[in-house]
């Protein structure tokens, strides 16, 4: 009996020290988007640190895609990844030959999830598939669990390379021996 009272007292003290847990979610999505940064680095001539505001000022692309996980059509808007790589000085178009063809891109999420694309897969002079860094879905900023940035590759049968909470893009030149 005394043990139960001590336990209740400890819980009460913990609540007073930490404060009651709120059932109302904090407005994280809005502040996360305004302070979030997307880093583009590695084998680039101009490393970039881009904010949501920076992306809004760039040429925009809208893609209507069927999300296989959700089994519904979603409309994403953002910037072509090819455009961001161009801005960072990554070889594209006619310069995509020789060593540039062994270059790959690693996209990483906040939780450490990583995916790889060959640079050629992202060059619209070579392929017809567009990959975007989205910041809105269905006309609204991405939800906290999705954004503030999300890589969307609609041409893929499985969305395994649709990176949620995208934080960085690293360009790597493969060493061929």
Name these PLM-found stretches.
Residues 8-22:
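Bacterial N-terminal signal peptides
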Residues 1-5:
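N-terminal secretory signal peptides that target proteins for export/translocation
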Residues 28-177:
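N-terminal intrinsically disordered, low-complexity segments enriched in P/E/S/T
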């Amino acid at each position: 009996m005394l043990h139960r009272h001590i336990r209740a007292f400890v819980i009460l003290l913990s609540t007073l020290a930490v404060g009651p847990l709120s059932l109302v979610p904090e407005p994280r999505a809005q502040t996360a988007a305004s302070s979030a940064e997307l880093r583009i680095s590695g084998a680039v001539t101009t490393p970039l640190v881009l904010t949501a505001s920076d992306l809004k000022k760039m040429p925009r692309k809208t893609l209507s895609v069927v999300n296989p996980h959700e089994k519904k059509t979603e409309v994403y808007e953002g910037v072509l990844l090819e455009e961001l790589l161009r801005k960072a000085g990554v070889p594209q178009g006619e310069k995509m030959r020789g060593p540039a063809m062994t270059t790959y891109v690693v996209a990483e999420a906040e939780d450490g999830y990583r995916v790889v694309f060959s640079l050629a897969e992202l060059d619209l002079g070579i392929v017809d598939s567009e990959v975007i860094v989205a910041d809105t879905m269905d006309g609204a900023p991405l939800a906290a669990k999705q954004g503030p940035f999300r890589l969307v590759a609609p041409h893929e049968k499985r969305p395994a390379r649709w990176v949620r909470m995208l934080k960085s893009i690293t360009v790597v030149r493969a060493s061929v021996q």
